[in-house]
């Protein structure tokens, strides 16, 4: 299914996207939206880019709450329940079995993991069933998970990817970012049931037919474009091949 929701300003675009994610899609499609809504943007920057949208979505879906731990790191605020993405391969992260008691984790309105963790590379000379769980390492670029624990005094976090938990120390947090909204560049190779894409003014180097095609083809069930028709027209007519973010 395909829908286009015209909006004039970037503020209207971002407000509509938050409403779609938080209320309209879950109300209409129910459980089909669990783990399945992904916002894909041309750029990180701007009022409808990933950085601003993720701040809005964190406030709407996983707000500050008594008993819900949070920790600041540079310009980011991480909170238990946040949806996050690993941004580069790191083979030094240690894994542990996910023994999180779901009743003990404050549940935001959407803590869907989205794309699961890729399997870590096999250690040479070992079969997988011979390797102790505590020794399996590695988290990979594009993996999406949910923060399940934050130890503020120790400056560490635990992030659940599928059925295991990765332990993050403070020196690893540069490689973690919020993932309710991601760039088209970061979405490559993934698929999602529902894709929402803002159509807002960005660099013409980014507003290309190839980028629009890549974003739209990430959707398995539904695509919703939100914004200005003129931006869609620009992207369709711009046949540049490079795609950066």
Question: Can you annotate each of these PLM segments?
Answer:
Residues 109-113, 117, 122-136, 141-245:
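C-terminal accessory regions
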Residues 1-114, 119-136:
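Conserved helicase motor core of P-loop NTPases
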């Amino acid at each position: 299914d395909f829908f286009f929701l015209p909006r004039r300003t970037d503020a209207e675009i971002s407000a509509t996207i938050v409403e779609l994610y938080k209320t309209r899609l879950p109300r209409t499609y129910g459980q089909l939206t669990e783990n399945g809504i992904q916002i894909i943007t041309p750029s990180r920057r701007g009022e409808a880019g990933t950085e601003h949208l993720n701040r809005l979505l964190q406030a709407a879906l996983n707000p500050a709450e008594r008993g819900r731990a949070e920790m600041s790191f540079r310009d980011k605020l991480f909170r238990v329940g946040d949806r996050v993405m690993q941004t580069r391969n790191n083979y030094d992260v240690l894994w542990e079995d996910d023994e999180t008691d779901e009743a003990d984790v404050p549940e935001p309105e959407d803590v869907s993991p989205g794309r699961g963790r890729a399997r870590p590379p096999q250690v040479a000379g070992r079969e997988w069933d011979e390797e102790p769980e505590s020794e399996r390492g590695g988290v990979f670029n594009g993996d999406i998970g949910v923060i399940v624990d934050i130890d503020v005094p120790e400056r560490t976090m635990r992030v659940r990817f599928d059925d295991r938990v990765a332990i993050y120390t403070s020196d690893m947090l540069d490689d973690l970012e919020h993932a309710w909204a991601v760039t088209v560049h970061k979405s490559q190779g993934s698929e999602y049931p529902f894709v929402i894409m803002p159509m807002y003014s960005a660099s013409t180097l980014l507003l290309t037919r190839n980028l629009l095609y890549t974003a739209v083809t990430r959707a398995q069930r539904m695509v919703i474009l939100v914004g200005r028709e003129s931006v869609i027209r620009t992207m369709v007519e711009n046949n540049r091949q490079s795609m950066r973010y």
